[in-house]
Amino acid sequence: MSKIFVNPSAIRAGLADLEMAEETVDLINRNVEDNQAHLQGEPIEVEALPEDMRRLHISEQKHSQLSDSACGKEEGSDDDFYMADSEDPYVPMQSYLDNVGIQIVKKMKTGERFFKIWSQAVEEIISYVTVNFPLPSGKSTDDKSTQTVSERSRQNPQPSSVKKEDQLSKTKVVSQEASGPPALEWSATNDEDDASVEAEIAHQIAESFSKKYKFPSRSSGIFLYNFEQLKTNLDDIVREAKRIPGVMRLAQDGLRLPLRCILGWVASTHSKRFQILVDSDKLSKIMQDDINRYLAY
């Protein structure tokens, strides 16, 4: 007979596995017993209940009526909170914006410049909003969050307002001296901001976005510069252009804007490379001459 030798370590490993299996079975049984502990107690008999509990009667009809009334209240509250699609004014506006987006994509496929397309779309959207969402005449447009002044400060607002105006005038002078060309005259004041005026400024700037302009360099030479080299957002350019005297008035009248002057001003405040290359004295003279020439027409 052939002898079969079994390694003692394999026997020990098998015994350990059997012990682990037995422990696992015991653990499962204990968990089952713990989970079913509430079923092992004595059942509650109805006869042992107090007398008050016998008087309770459950009516399914009343419960259904209560649930129906609760659902009705919830539906009513939802109807009060949400408007129908026919009454919601933002539904046609959403469809209008979708159509505008489709038109923009079509124009971009034809090869038109994006800034020209976008300026036209902005004007159309502004006109749509002003026509379909007019401001109520009887209500004030002031922000309620800022109207937290006490009654005493409302009765005597003159000293604080005078101080604020003085501080604003001082800060304007300091900022103009620090950032603007030194020889540019800032005596003229811009008119009130208007969305149509901003759209006109943005439209003219976008039309000439890549047009080359000439500026005198520090070496008395001439170098070219345009709005694209600024790498600045169009909204920021328009915001800076409104600070130039006379630009708002020209835009309100629909006249041509001094784009070289606008570019020189924005570049002198936002582009360090432009500040290094350009001669500030010659630049300020060019900007002042452009403003005077355009305002004279």
Curated annotation (Swiss-Prot):
GO terms for biological process: symbiont-mediated suppression of host innate immune response; symbiont-mediated suppression of host JAK-STAT cascade via inhibition of STAT1 activity; symbiont-mediated suppression of host JAK-STAT cascade via inhibition of STAT2 activity; symbiont-mediated suppression of host type I interferon-mediated signaling pathway; viral transcription. The modification Phosphoserine is found at S64, S210, S271. Keywords: Chaperone, Host cytoplasm, Host nucleus, Host-virus interaction, Inhibition of host innate immune response by virus, Inhibition of host interferon signaling pathway by virus, Inhibition of host STAT1 by virus, Inhibition of host STAT2 by virus, Interferon antiviral system evasion, Phosphoprotein, Viral immunoevasion, Viral RNA replication, Virion. GO terms for cellular component: host cell cytoplasm; host cell nucleus; virion component. Phosphorylated by host PKC and by an unknown kinase. Belongs to the lyssavirus protein P family. This is Phosphoprotein. It comes from Khujand virus. The gene is P.
